[in-house]
Design a protein with these regions (language model features):
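Gly/Ser-rich phosphate-binding catalytic loop and adjacent alpha/beta segment
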Residues: 3-176
Length: 176
């Protein structure tokens, strides 16, 4: 499917989401912007997702956060560690709290225990929580040093799981 078709698909698929529709209608006629947002899917790299905030397959938004989280949930369930849970932290960037909450809700809906911090926490606190609680993984919503229009979804896992999760998500996410 080309980027124009994907753009149209999002307009139809999210017709009841006013925020998404308003943003997407706001770029109507701007071929370069539509292409940039929809020519590819945001890729899961070594530590997770990172991208410019906005609507589209190549942007950081709740839909891509849910998609990545479903991939993580499927992996943890396949490993039999869903009851160990996932600790979730977030920083002060735009929508970090929203993405963290969506991560927790998506994990819970998939049957994976989720521990969501109730306020901002730095990455070292997340890594401590993962070990202290015996979690299978941790997620921190942050884009670290990137400009303010970016956000990210970073995974924290034990080394034994990290490579196989990354490999699985790179294969699986296009189908989710």
């Amino acid at each position: 499917m080309g980027y124009k078709e994907e753009y149209q698909r999002w307009l139809e698929m999210f017709a009841n989401d006013a925020e998404t529709i308003n943003e997407l209608k706001g770029i109507a006629g701007d071929e370069k912007e539509i292409e940039d947002r929809f020519y590819t899917e945001l890729a899961f790299g070594t530590a997770g997702l990172r991208g410019v905030l906005g609507m589209g397959t190549n942007r950081m938004n709740v839909y891509n956060v849910r998609r990545a989280t479903m991939g993580v949930a499927k992996y943890l369930i396949a490993q039999g560690v869903q009851d160990q849970g996932v600790a979730i932290a977030y920083d002060s960037r735009i929508k970090s709290d929203v993405f963290a909450r969506e991560t927790a809700l998506t994990l819970a809906a998939a049957g994976v225990k989720a521990y969501l911090f109730d306020a901002l926490r730095p990455v070292p606190v997340l890594s401590y929580a993962v070990r202290h609680l015996g979690c299978a993984a941790g997620v921190v919503i942050t884009a670290s040093h990137n400009p303010p229009q970016y956000n990210g979804y970073k995974m924290w896992m034990l080394r034994s799981y990290r490579r196989s999760l990354q490999s699985l998500l790179q294969r699986q996410l296009p189908g989710l």
